[in-house]
């Protein structure tokens, strides 16, 4: 009986430990965490890695699979990394809150991307991105989308589910028609959607 009781105590401690480990850090605590810039170093203690900033070689056009072992990761910066695609495994980073993918070569994001339900900030600026995943409405924590200098002409209808939480979509330097901007604002009446590039492109789309 004592052995059984001891067993369940150990199980309870383990479950509690995993639960605590899987919780998001408050912003102030997150800022105090080390920013890892070496994937090799990060993989030595993957459960202790909350912030990662990488520069990737040109021959690497997608996120290294090892990154998805960092399941406590909450901030990921992959600025100017020559990325052409985002791996479907991106959905494994369940605690990710801040994601910087600016200055890459991304045209679209996989549907698995919308499994990042804790994401608060998404920076996809300066990519030739033309669309967002259809199920963007699943990303209930999303507050800011920086899509400056992209080709994002339309938004998925499901994004209307974020009308109460999404604060800003930056579409400056996106060749929008006025009618396209109006359609976006109707989907998200409480969201600020700045844009600064008018395009008289009726013949193009």
List PLM regions with ranges.
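General helical secondary-structure elements
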Residues: 1-2, 93
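Per-repeat beta-strand-to-loop junction in leucine-rich repeat
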Residues: 55-57, 79-80, 102-103, 112, ...
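The feature captures the LRR N-terminal capping module
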Residues: 2-7, 13, 18-79, 84-88, ...
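Hydrophobic packing within well-folded, soluble alpha/beta domains
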Residues: 73-76, 90, 96-101, 106-109, ...
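Low-complexity, compositionally biased segments
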Residues: 75, 90-92, 107, 126, ...
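Hydrophobic anchor residues at the C-terminal helix/turn of individual leucine-rich repeat
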Residues: 43, 66-69, 89-92, 106, ...
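Short hydrophobic/aromatic-rich motifs at helix boundaries and adjacent loops
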Residues: 35-36, 152-155
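Canonical position 11/12 of the leucine-rich repeat
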Residues: 58-61, 82-84, 105-108, 128-131, ...
